[in-house]
Design a protein with these regions (language model features):
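Glycan-recognition and catalytic cores of secretory/periplasmic carbohydrate-active enzymes
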Residues: 1-395
């Protein structure tokens, strides 16, 4: 057993969350005029665009509600979550409880509700806030959204799907991954527990029996929606190591919930195969996208190093170690921990950078934008704090 000071690691992540990350979002992201949150924040927290992206609205509600429920009953956190939820409730969705992709500052829709992930993060937000407030209204909203997600699951984009029907129908890995996590989030408020278990079973089957390719040691981002088979095209060859590792720690939680040690061991084994494939052996860090055959990429950002990829991977590795004691997981966590704090942490301003080039140099100094908001950094800091603290108790 190596001498790793888990208590010091836990303290470092807790301090970063409480003193650096959360104050940044509380101070700079809240729109005190129209409600909701600004996510387009520059390095120093100044707002550079006022459009509101519904994924990130829901994620920030969830974040502060979750911390209120699990860390401390901080009234500032709860007030932040409630005002964001009220904005979403009033402006975020159409009459069918489909959530728009983006709104202008005042809450008028900008982009149609084509993206089902707007629904999934709204569902998580209202479910977590229902726990924090005891509000039956928020619980009912979460249940309505969950039902709508299940209705849309087989054709998530619906009328806004741009693919020509029938030629090459595909389904993507991200949806079962997110639903897998969402199921645990809303367990306490669901009235029909059978639907919950069926949803979890379906997601586990989809991820492990359809998207996961044992001979490749990774999940494919897209497979045929007709028979679940791999497709030899740009989308079909695409792998995203960060997505894989995020899904794997979600499923480790399901393994814990079900007391399934064999499942946990399998997930840890897969996670090690994924990270070994995804790691950039020349410059360090994890590639954003890879082609399963090593063919040229269609996505120009394939070799960038992104904040969420490394944070989610660190969670997967530390959780794998905590659950199984596998030293390879610990080795990878320590390597990722060093990479995160060396490359993504801003030494001059709060919050972390999101986008690096392949060499690990900062590409964009923003702290928030269309895709980066109050989610992966604070959730990751919280998760790694808790996991390290748990490992420290076992020393």
């Amino acid at each position: 057993m190596r001498n790793v000071d888990f208590k010091q690691i836990a303290s470092r992540y807790e301090k970063e969350l409480r003193e650096n990350c959360l104050p940044f979002w509380l101070e700079h992201s809240q729109d005190n005029v129209f409600g909701g949150y600004f996510s387009c924040l520059d390095r120093d927290g100044s707002v550079y665009d006022t459009d509101k992206f519904v994924w990130l609205q829901g994620r920030e509600v969830w974040m502060f509600a979750m911390l209120y429920n699990k860390v401390e009953k901080n009234p500032e956190w709860l007030a932040c979550a409630v005002q964001g939820a009220e904005f979403l409730k009033k402006y975020g969705h159409d009459d069918n409880w489909d959530f728009y992709f983006s709104l202008n500052r005042e809450g008028r829709p900008l982009v149609q509700p084509y993206n089902i992930f707007s629904n999934t993060f709204a569902c998580m937000a209202f479910a977590q806030l229902a726990k924090a407030t005891g509000s039956d209204e928020y619980a009912q909203i979460a249940r309505k959204i969950f039902s709508r997600i299940l209705e849309r699951r087989s054709n998530p984009k619906g009328q806004w799907c741009k693919a020509y029907p029938g030629t090459r129908p595909m389904k993507d890995f991200a949806l079962p991954m997110i639903i897998c996590n969402m199921a645990l989030e809303i367990e306490d408020i669901l009235e029909d527990k059978d639907i919950l278990e069926q949803t979890i079973d379906t997601c586990l089957h989809e991820i492990l029996d359809v998207f996961y390719q044992p001979e490749l040691g990774c999940m494919l981002e897209n497979v045929s929606s007709l028979d679940g088979k791999p497709l030899d095209c740009f989308e079909g060859r695409e792998i995203n190591p960060g997505h894989d590792l995020e899904a794997l720690w979600f499923m480790m939680n399901l393994g814990v919930r079900r007391g399934d040690k064999a499942l946990i061991e399998k997930l840890v084994d897969i996670s090690l195969r994924v990270i070994e494939r995804g790691w950039d052996k020349e410059y360090g860090g994890i590639f954003y996208f890879l082609d399963v055959k090593g063919a040229p990429q269609q996505k120009l950002e394939w070799d960038q190093k992104l904040w969420w990829v490394h944070i989610e991977s660190a969670i997967a590795m530390l959780k794998g170690y905590q659950l199984t004691g596998n030293e390879k997981c610990l080795d990878w966590f320590l390597k990722l921990d060093d990479y995160l704090w060396t490359h993504f942490k801003d030494k001059e301003y709060p919050e972390w950078f999101g986008y690096l080039n392949r060499r690990g140099e900062v590409l964009l100094t923003l702290k928030g934008g269309k895709w980066k908001g109050c989610f992966h950094v604070p959730r990751g800091l919280y998760q790694l704090w808790q996991l390290a603290a748990d490992c420290g108790r076992g020393e």
